[in-house]
Amino acid sequence: AFVTWTAEPRHDMHSFPGVLAAVAGVLLLTFACVRARVYDDRAAAVALGLGALPNLAVAGSGLLPLTDGDGIGRLQFLLACAVVLVAAVVLTLVSPRGDGPFVAFVCASAIGLFTVFAATVWRMEAVETAALCAPLAVGALAFLPGLAMRFARLPIGFASPHAARPTYGADLDPDADRAPQDPVDADRIAAQARRGHELLIGLVGGCALVSVGAAAVLGFSDDGWGQLLALATGVAMLMRAQLFRYTAQVAATLAAGLACLVLLGVGLCLNPSDSLMRDALNGDTAALDLRTIWLVAAIAAAAVLCTAVGLITSRSGVTPFWGRFLEIAEVFVLLTLV
């Protein structure tokens, strides 16, 4: 996928490289479906499916040719998200189990499709589109457990087999109004619970992918508010990890938060302002050195804080005071995203 994307200087995939990417994507998608449906080979299906999605995204961006004099834009990204969404849905439907990675791409491509469509309608820039994706991905995390249970069709709620009010003669025969109950299918409920767990992992992974992509755009921009939003997104993803209890879900959220902060740091290091670069080229590096000191101090403070939290909580846990403090801090960080 990377070779075909870089083969054309303008990234116009409405050409021979796009055809190669489409052929590779369709073949990998077909092999993934066969391994999942016929052979029940989860590992091979996931590997082949994840290999197919980037190629299909590259091929999807070339469904329409570029306008003369213009590069790749919102329309091409919209088509790429649509193709990835269709392919990920197909892979999810044909996979009998272990389709969490495909659900993640379904969620991420659906959010990308919605935001790029909004950016196309309202003529939004890349930073504005990323600023829309970041709060959407963070805010959606709170609704994912209930959404996963609905998709898995878990039996939610309880209907009493007895009447709400005893009828005439109930004191004589306590079992007079009791209807015969079917035996509980424990295996089916356990399978639905596992299905809900897999769906939740995929949905969390999709929101994590969107947040990391938005933080990459915001962190490498020259907009100060955008960089602050990338910082808030990373901190919010770290704090939102307390919503989940399973290791995979917590790890995905924590990894996304750390990736957002790392991308912000890399963007700040690689993209100093034009005025600082002009002064440095003229021999005046004082302002650039001061900026470097601030960046190093901030990175060191973040590393010390993460290390301290990991060492303290693994030994003694979180006290009620610090738990309440983290909840208040989480509310404050979420408000900054709005």
Task: List where the protein language model places each region.
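Core alpha-helical transmembrane segments of integral membrane proteins
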Residues: 1-97, 106-117
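Transmembrane helix-loop junctions in multi-pass membrane proteins
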Residues: 5-11, 36-38, 62-68, 209-222, ...
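Pore- and pathway-forming membrane helices of multi-pass small-molecule/ion transporters and channels
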Residues: 23-27, 82-86, 103-116, 229-239, ...
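Cytoplasmic-side transmembrane-helix entry/capping segments in multi-pass membrane proteins
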Residues: 41-52, 100-109, 249-259, 326-330
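Hydrophobic alpha-helical transmembrane segments in multi-pass integral membrane proteins
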Residues: 56-68, 115-126, 262-280, 337-338
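Internal alpha-helical transmembrane segments of multi-pass membrane proteins
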Residues: 71-82, 96-105, 277, 284-299
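Generic multipass alpha-helical transmembrane bundles of integral membrane proteins
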Residues: 79-253, 268, 272
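C-terminal transmembrane helix-loop-helix hairpin of multi-pass membrane proteins
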Residues: 129-133, 196-204, 243-258, 265-338
